[in-house]
């Protein structure tokens, strides 16, 4: 009887403990158990794309895939069959090595083996499809996704786009300036795992994505790829022809400050050498600076449209003598002839009419001595010398573009102020930013920083610079039917011991149309060998770029784009379903592309995956082959017609 009581009490104790554990402490123990086997894994996000204004993708994150295995889950009886499957899809696959590694890891009870093969999308999908057909092979084989930054046609854009560091962060150019916008937000997958030493996301059970991965935003630039290639090629040819130290150029919209093209030579051999010279390299501009001196004198009222300046060809300033470059600028010169023939003495005389403080003030007003604020990394600037140090000699030198250093972009923006109805605008490279669904989340707009010169002063200077092209030092820039304004510049380079004989910066600035300027360009060649005058060295590539611009855009002499453009139609389909189009491409299904623009097409079209494609025309998609819904693969020939 005693034993029965003991057994009965034992059962009561067990039941009481079970009740305590399961009912009273049940939730607590369940949570503890879940915590023991709960795992979270990061889902990588893609960095945003960088796209030109005409729709060419310059930078994007491409997907590659690693094969990873859990050797303990692979059935030894099926290993040969698995090796055969992988060999049929990976040409360089080493069957004996991989088989040996799997068996060795399995004996060691190792849960993770990454094969040394990087797969593209089609290879990965083919293997996945075959594994799905044979369930006996699928166990223990997984894929890990990697993102690699790809740059397309990088040579012409390298110094503008920049590059990333090993942590996928921008360290130069637009990649750095807009790093926060381009960087996505990684997601998190949570689930329960079976007990094992190594866990992958593929071994999780009851998974859920508790934080969705959000890809980075896409940047649409002001740059036009055709104009960028044109400018870049002209700089290359000039750089090589004159065996120069460097060459740089910028093409911009006058009224808006949009940069349409910006490039330089020589090109960097590696990331450490990347340098955006138009915003980093300082130079003395020489005679291209003279319109600023004349505009300042007119604005201050020390000269007017009727002013005539007398020159004997030389002038003494303190203990220095300033000479004209030749006899064409001696005698009595109107302001128009002074600019057209590029006289130095006349500029000194105009500067002497101004109070030093006033002259200095206008140097600041046109943006010299401070950065332009362009939206890219590494812009430099040299401060103006202190006002107290502005001697008569220094003021006289600056009047004709010597003794003052600036970047090419600073010089262009200052000259642009003179021709742009007196308005100093802020230059920019990014037009707008779009999110993953194609919604514009930020739109840059033209910014007028200051109204520096009156309309009358600007108009007079535009016509003075037109005379440079019609009868002065820049006559080679004439384009039949178009009113071009310009200014040549040849500046002797300064060194440690003063100005260096035989070393020059050769420049040419131009704009059109004269009455209401739309486009402006500045090209500068550093130390050309052979010829060195701006009219001989820098003018020809400027003219070539303008000729290409006029033809490409269909621009009439008034600066209006006359080529009939397809009117932009707001189509709910393209705004709502660009993401779906991208997904259908990803799933090897031809989407319905009708109605979307070339820019949108290029933003979602996977060029590397479907490389056999042809796009015809511009505007919006009108016809496509294959038809929507057709299965496609890497060998499919795709043709898109736009109007």
Where in this protein do the model-derived segments appear?
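Hydrophobic alpha-helical transmembrane signal-anchor segments
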Residues: 1-28
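Ligand-recognition elements built from short beta-strands and adjacent flexible loops
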Residues: 481, 523-529, 533-536, 543-643
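Conserved, well-ordered alpha-helix/loop/beta-strand core segments that scaffold catalytic motifs
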Residues: 203-247
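Short, small/polar residue-rich loop motifs at catalytic or cofactor-binding pockets
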Residues: 42-46, 243-247, 427, 615, ...
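Beta-lactam-recognizing serine transpeptidase/beta-lactamase-like catalytic domain environment
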Residues: 54, 59, 198-210, 247-286, ...
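Small/polar-residue-rich segments within soluble enzyme cores
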Residues: 84, 104-215, 523, 540
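A short, polar/charged loop-to-alpha-helix boundary motif
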Residues: 67-82, 267-280
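Short extracytoplasmic/periplasmic juxtamembrane "stem" segments immediately C-terminal to an N-terminal membrane anchor
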Residues: 30-48
């Amino acid at each position: 009887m005693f034993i029965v009581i003991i057994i009965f009490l034992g059962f009561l104790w067990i039941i009481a403990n079970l009740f305590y554990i399961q009912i009273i402490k049940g939730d607590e123990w369940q949570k503890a158990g879940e915590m023991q086997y709960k795992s979270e894994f990061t889902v990588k996000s893609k960095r945003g794309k960088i796209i030109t204004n005409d729709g060419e993708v310059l930078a994007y994150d491409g997907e590659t895939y690693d094969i990873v295995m859990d050797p303990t889950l692979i059935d030894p009886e099926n290993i040969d069959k698995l090796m055969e499957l992988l060999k049929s899809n990976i040409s360089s696959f080493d069957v004996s090595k991989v088989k040996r590694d799997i068996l060795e890891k399995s004996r060691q009870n190792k849960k993770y083996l990454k094969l040394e093969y990087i797969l593209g999308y089609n290879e990965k999908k083919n293997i996945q499809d075959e594994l799905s057909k044979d369930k006996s092979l699928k166990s223990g084989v997984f894929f890990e996704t990697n993102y690699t930054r790809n740059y397309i046609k990088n040579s012409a854009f390298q110094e503008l786009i920049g590059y990333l560091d090993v942590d996928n962060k921008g360290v130069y150019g637009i990649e750095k300036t807009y790093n926060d916008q381009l960087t996505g937000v990684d997601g998190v997958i949570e689930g329960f795992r079976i007990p094992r030493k190594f866990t992958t996301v593929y071994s999780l059970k009851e998974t859920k994505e508790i934080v969705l991965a959000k890809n980075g935003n896409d940047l649409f630039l002001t740059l036009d790829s055709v104009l960028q290639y044109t400018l870049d090629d002209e700089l290359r040819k000039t750089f090589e022809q004159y065996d120069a130290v460097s060459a740089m150029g910028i093409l911009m919209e006058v009224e808006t400050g949009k940069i349409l093209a910006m490039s330089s030579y020589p090109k960097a051999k590696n990331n450490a050498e990347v340098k955006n010279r138009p915003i980093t390299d300082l130079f003395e501009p020489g005679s291209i600076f003279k319109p600023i001196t004349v505009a300042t004198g007119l604005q201050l009222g020390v000269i007017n449209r009727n002013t005539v300046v007398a020159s004997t060809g030389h002038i003494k300033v303190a203990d220095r003598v300033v000479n004209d470059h030749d006899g064409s600028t001696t005698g009595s010169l109107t302001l128009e002839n002074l600019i057209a023939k590029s006289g130095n003495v006349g500029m000194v005389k105009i500067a002497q009419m101004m109070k030093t403080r006033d002259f200095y003030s206008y140097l600041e007003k046109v943006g010299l001595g401070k950065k332009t604020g362009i939206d890219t990394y590494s812009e430099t600037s040299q401060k103006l010398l202190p006002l107290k140090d502005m001697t008569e000699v220094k003021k006289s030198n600056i009047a004709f573009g010597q003794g003052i250093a600036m970047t090419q972009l600073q010089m262009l923006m200052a000259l642009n102020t003179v021709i742009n109805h007196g308005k100093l605008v802020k230059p920019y490279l990014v037009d707008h930013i779009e999110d993953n669904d194609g919604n514009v989340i930020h739109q840059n707009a033209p910014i007028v920083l200051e109204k520096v010169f009156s309309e009358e002063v600007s108009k007079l200077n535009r016509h003075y610079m037109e005379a440079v092209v019609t009868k002065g030092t820049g006559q080679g820039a004439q384009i039949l039917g178009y009113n071009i304004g310009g200014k040549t510049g040849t500046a002797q380079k300064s060194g440690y011991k003063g100005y260096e004989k035989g070393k020059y910066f050769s420049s040419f600035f131009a704009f059109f149309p004269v009455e209401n300027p739309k486009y402006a360009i500045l090209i500068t060649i550093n130390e050309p060998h052979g010829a060195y005058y701006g009219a001989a060295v820098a003018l020809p590539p400027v003219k070539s770029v303008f000729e290409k611009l006029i033809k490409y855009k269909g621009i009439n002499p008034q600066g209006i784009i006359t080529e009939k453009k397809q009117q932009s139609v707001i189509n709910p389909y393209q705004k709502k379903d660009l993401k779906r189009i991208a997904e259908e491409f990803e799933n090897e299904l031809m989407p319905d592309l009708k109605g979307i623009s070339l820019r949108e097409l290029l933003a979602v079209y996977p060029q590397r995956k479907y490389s056999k494609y042809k796009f015809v025309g511009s505007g919006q998609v009108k016809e496509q082959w294959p038809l929507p819904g057709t299965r496609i693969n890497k060998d499919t020939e795709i043709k898109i017609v736009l109007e």
